[in-house]
Amino acid sequence: MTKVSKDKLSKYKELDKAAFEFENVKVKKFFDRSNLEGYSLDTTGFLANPGFFQAPHHREATSENDIAFVGCPLDLGAIGLSGARHGPKAMREGSRNYGPMNDVTGEIPFEQCNIIDYGDVEWSCTNLDVRVSEDIPLVFESLSSKGLNTLSCGGEHTTTYGVLKGLSTGHDDSFGLIQLDAHCDTMSTWGGDTINDGSVFRQAVLDGYIDPERTVQIGIRGRANFLWEFSHDTGMTVITADEVFEKGVEYVI
């Protein structure tokens, strides 16, 4: 067994002088700026701001903001799968112990753009169609008109229809779509409802929000494949889960 030399110990003690401080210059600069702006960040997770990745909460978004995180806590249309409404809360809670630096790239997103947590969509009533066709689009249309990019979190799949409708307002072109999912969600009515948890992207095509020929559905699997004929008939690119495993990520990209 070899004892550590005095020279090495001295070196280690020099490195230790910055203990409990942010030795990374990039991170220190970020935290210093946050403190100067009166916005203190917690690294322990116990006292963390409840915003997504501790982003500041701003209900009145402006053109100075670049990205807004928006929660859509809804699961009225997910028959037998209630609980998806807790998604936004869980995402915020789970993000508290991460950041501010991306551990792979070494970049700090909050230094590259102005990010806010808008909060959750407020529901005007308990009716699913109204929430999806009116409440959600209203929020995303407003944010889009101010030039913000949005990151939405559901909630069940029907929330995506509302997001697409809101973002489409004021745009002449239909969106291209990359969908990572187990199901295509292009079935017809379910229980008499045109917009439901399994028909989101069928209805989005019919209403002109997405272009099926520029839509790619990745990871499709399960016993309900016979319900997704609309995807194939309209020209969507459907890549099954088996294809992903057999051919790899590079093939998918």
Where are these regions (language model features)?
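Conserved alpha-helical scaffold segments that buttress catalytic/binding sites
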Residues: T2-I253
